[in-house]
Regions:
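Catalytic core of Fe(II)/2-oxoglutarate
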Residues: 1-2, 11-127
Length: 127
C-alpha cells in the first residue's frame, strides 16, 4: 500500500505561466469527490513535494500544462510502500482530481474512478 508520494521536479526551464502545478484537494465525504483546492505547488527545478496517499488523497493539475515547443514538465515520482494497516481500508490507485472544466463531466469522473480501481485499472491503460 502506498503511504507517501515524493515528487521531485527536474525541469529547469519551466516558468509559472506554463502551468503544471501540483494541486492537493480536500475530500468531500458526502460525494466522495475532491472538495476544495487546499495547496498549489509550482513545479520549480529541484523542488521536492511529499504528500500522503490515503484513500481520499486527491491530487492533480489545477493549472493545465501549456508549454512552448521544446519545454516539458519533467518529474520523478517515488512511492513509499508499506503493508496495509489493519485499521485502514485497502488503498486503491492514485486519485486524480478533475480540472474545473471537467468536474461535472460524467465521462471524466468515470475515467478517474476506473483509473483508481486497483482491480480494473488495466481497462483504462494500455499495458
Amino acid at each position: 500500500q502506498r503511504w507517501w508520494n515524493i515528487i521531485v521536479y527536474l525541469s529547469d526551464d519551466l516558468q509559472p505561466e506554463h502551468g503544471g502545478h501540483l494541486g492537493l484537494w480536500s475530500h468531500d465525504p458526502e460525494t466522495n469527490l475532491p472538495k476544495e483546492l487546499k495547496v498549489e505547488v509550482e513545479p520549480k527545478f529541484n523542488r521536492a513535494v511529499i504528500f500522503d496517499t490515503t484513500q481520499n488523497s486527491w491530487h492533480g493539475l489545477p493549472i493545465e500544462l501549456n508549454t512552448p515547443k521544446g519545454i516539458c514538465r519533467q518529474s520523478m515520482a517515488v512511492y513509499y510502500l508499506t503493508e496495509p494497516r489493519i485499521e485502514s481500508c485497502l488503498r486503491q490507485r492514485a486519485l486524480f482530481a478533475p480540472h474545473e472544466n471537467q468536474k461535472d463531466n460524467p465521462e471524466v469522473l468515470d475515467l478517474i474512478k476506473k483509473r483508481a480501481d486497483s482491480q480494473n485499472y488495466s481497462s483504462v491503460y494500455r499495458i
